[in-house]
């Protein structure tokens, strides 16, 4: 067995012996394999060869949004697993991490709950810090929840379209992201960069809805009601691939967020979900830290209105 740095063409060679990616996370990690870089983001990638044929790869890299850990990923061809190759690659990544520019050496990864990777990660000293699920909601499956109105029948809430370039929306997205990632706090960053990461054309965002509350009082003061929940829709990256055809039952990926301090957060979530999934299926990512959303998703799963399409753990060493 020989080990060497990643070089151009390794991805094509590995795809000849690797099966399809087991999850979206695995596909994303595969896309992160690249030659070593000392620029931002710093990266080191290794390849394991057996008799001159690439059979495994591993990478470790920094990110500017989450700086307390380095991302790490190891994948070995199924026919060569349980032979110590993954362990050797991980040990080499740990040694390479000693030279990261930030000085951070702790590793973080994401593993599918049903995969052998969980057992491997725990055996290598990693521990689970969060569970993440991608959940599919079928068209028309979410019960409708009426918007509030006052005694005169005037609406005190409103759902409206909002530009993805909105500073107000960007701030709400960032507030939600920080509150839902206290288990792995993001670094402080500008709203401009937040917009680029989550709401830009580059991020494949193509539309957004918001739920506003107390709109009558706000309007009387020349303002709009405060945003209590939001939903951002994304185009799948595969849309840019030549010959890609959208399946009839394809679901739209949605980032669903809400005000953690809003007493009626669960109701607000349903008020957003119902119109979103009225005619077409959607997928939503939910973590254990999103307690109100997680509880509602569990209820929808029990009702048969939702199903888990991906279930993974974030692990750190």
Segments and roles (model prediction):
Residues 135-168, 296-317:
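C-terminal "cap" of GNAT-fold acetyltransferases
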Residues 47-98, 104-107:
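Long, hydrophobic/aromatic-enriched structural stretches that serve as scaffold segments
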Residues 1-33, 145-189:
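Short amphipathic alpha-helix that is part of the acyltransferase structural core
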Residues 57, 61-72, 81, 227, ...:
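A conserved beta-turn-beta hairpin within the catalytic core of GNAT-like acetyltransferases
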Residues 214-216, 235-317:
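Extended, charged low-complexity segments
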Residues 87, 99-105, 109-131, 289-307:
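Conserved active-site alpha-helix within GNAT-family acetyltransferase domains
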Residues 11-59, 184-221:
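Active-site rim helix/loop that mediates acceptor-substrate recognition in acyltransferases
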Residues 76, 82-95, 123, 261-279:
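Conserved acetyl-CoA-binding loop-helix of GNAT-fold acetyltransferases
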